Amino acid sequence: MSRNSYIQQSSDIQAAGGLVPMVIEQSARGERAYDIYSRLLKERVIFLVGPVEDYMANLVVAQMLFLEAENPDKDIHLYINSPGGSVTAGMSIYDTMQFIKPDVSTICIGQACSMGAFLLAAGAKGKRHCLPNSRVMIHQPLGGFQGQATDIEIHAQEILNIKARLNELLAYHTGQDLETIKRDTERDNFMSASRAAEYGLIDSVYDKRQLAS
């Protein structure tokens, strides 16, 4: 694929009120300008920042599929700084992480709460990390519905089904038993980076990057 195929995120970030730095690459054919996120995508770095919702999830999924097509044997690095969000949007990212061939390494920068914490834990074993002052929070899914009594009952059962499934997956990825997960997600459960490592949500706390000599 050509370099023009790299997904551009700058317009979305600018719409949110931010300025996106540009980087200039020199080559035999001259100079080429990239927004910083497109340049990092070339290094197989994806950012999951802000609330997890359908549009953002679609961008993350598209980038993972693109990087798999580029090189199915090289790790993808997913940087997470998210308060959580939609379960269905988050599960589309989760399922893609499990589906594609490359390992997805997850790194928490800032916070990984709710669905953000779930996706952090869903990274490849041995490749899930937090920076030292990151915060992680797990809890049960939230939801609300208005309507007829029967419809409310249907939606209440659905959110209980989702809760049970998320607990099962969290138990699988952390190594905790299901009863522990049920108890610990009953209310907002905040953890430091070191506590998240002890719990099994991540594998290690990054302090300094290990550079190749």
Curated annotation (Swiss-Prot):
PROSITE patterns: CLP_PROTEASE_HIS, CLP_PROTEASE_SER
Cellular-component GO terms for this entry: cytoplasm; endopeptidase Clp complex
Gene Ontology molecular function terms on file: ATP-dependent peptidase activity; ATPase binding; serine-type endopeptidase activity
GO process annotations (BP): protein quality control for misfolded or incompletely synthesized proteins
UniProt catalytic activity: Hydrolysis of proteins to small peptides in the presence of ATP and magnesium. alpha-casein is the usual test substrate. In the absence of ATP, only oligopeptides shorter than five residues are hydrolyzed (such as succinyl-Leu-Tyr-|-NHMec, and Leu-Tyr-Leu-|-Tyr-Trp, in which cleavage of the -Tyr-|-Leu- and -Tyr-|-Trp bonds also occurs)
EC number(s) given by UniProt: 3.4.21.92
Active-site residues (renumbered): S114, H139
Alphabetical list of SUPFAM superfamilies matching this protein: ClpP/crotonase
Keyword Transmembrane (UniProt): no
Principal EC category: hydrolase
Annotated InterPro entries: ClpP, ClpP/crotonase-like_dom_sf, ClpP/TepA, ClpP_His_AS, ClpP_Ser_AS
UniProt keyword Hydrolase, yes or no: yes
Compartmental location: Cytoplasm
Keywords assigned: Cytoplasm, Hydrolase, Protease, Serine protease
Annotated function: Cleaves peptides in various proteins in a process that requires ATP hydrolysis. Has a chymotrypsin-like activity. Plays a major role in the degradation of misfolded proteins.
Similarity remark: Belongs to the peptidase S14 family.
Assembly notes: Fourteen ClpP subunits assemble into 2 heptameric rings which stack back to back to give a disk-like structure with a central cavity, resembling the structure of eukaryotic proteasomes.
Name assigned to this protein: ATP-dependent Clp protease proteolytic subunit
